Amino acid sequence: RYKEYDLLHAHYGLSGLLATMQLSIPVVITFHGSDVNMKKNYLFSRIASRLSAANIFVHQRLPEKLKIYRGSVNIIPCGFDNNLFFPIAKEEARKTLKWGENTRYIAFSSAFDNKIKNVQLAWSAISGINNCNLIELKGYGKEKINLILNASDLLLVTSLSETGPIIVKEALACNCPIISTNVGDVQRLIKNVRNCYISSYNPDDIKKKISLVFRGNKRTNGEKVIKNFKLENIAYKVIDVYRDTLKNY
């Protein structure tokens, strides 16, 4: 059914470029990272960013890479759904998942076959740790991932590149300890969170930090730190961009 719209919001550079082909209503584009960082997508995104009425970036480095230094640049990271991700007692979550009480479980940030996630580093880091399982976060619904994050001893991120991994925000919302390479906005997110660590790409360094988490055996205060990234708070910021765009169009 035909409807009239006041504004079009596209996600990713290529979709945004297609959206700007019509000239009747303003276009807002959100750039997520892969559309800027990957060579095959860069040109599409750069052109789209010049044709749009406003641009949203999930990380402050993205407009710099597109060489945008003025105009409508809005840094709004992706949010998480606090109705789906929240703390549950680890013992209760493990009981629901039928996990062993005395086994160590480390949640891996993504699918093992995603090369950018660098799972080989994770395997190297946990080698030699007795009774420890690396859990692949692939093929699960949000409810199950919430249980896994609450049941796991920690979330491990060994990525070669990220912009703003949502799984880190979701883990923080579950008070799950995090060990991560210094990618995207992770360092800023966990800066004031206890029992979370930034690691190098040295497996021995990661192993030492895993030992610190295991030895401390405590959850984090991530739920309190991450509250500003709830979906509704992010939505208000996006709506403000819509209003400013329509006012200035």
Question: Where are these predicted regions, by residue range?
Answer:
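Short His-centered aromatic/hydrophobic patch
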Residues: 10-15
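A charged, aromatic-enriched C-terminal amphipathic alpha-helix characteristic of glycosyltransferases
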Residues: 201, 215-247
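Acidic anion/phosphate-binding donor-loop and adjacent secondary structure
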Residues: 39-40, 80-96
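Conserved donor-binding/catalytic core segment of Leloir-type glycosyltransferases
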Residues: 100-117, 123-129
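Aromatic "clamp/platform" in nucleotide-sugar-dependent glycosyltransferases that forms part
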Residues: 160
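Short hydrophobic beta-strand element within catalytic cores of glycosyltransferases
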Residues: 177-180
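Conserved acidic donor-binding segment of nucleotide-sugar-dependent glycosyltransferases
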Residues: 192-203, 211-215
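Short alpha-helical donor nucleotide-sugar binding micro-motif in glycosyltransferases
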Residues: 49, 147-152
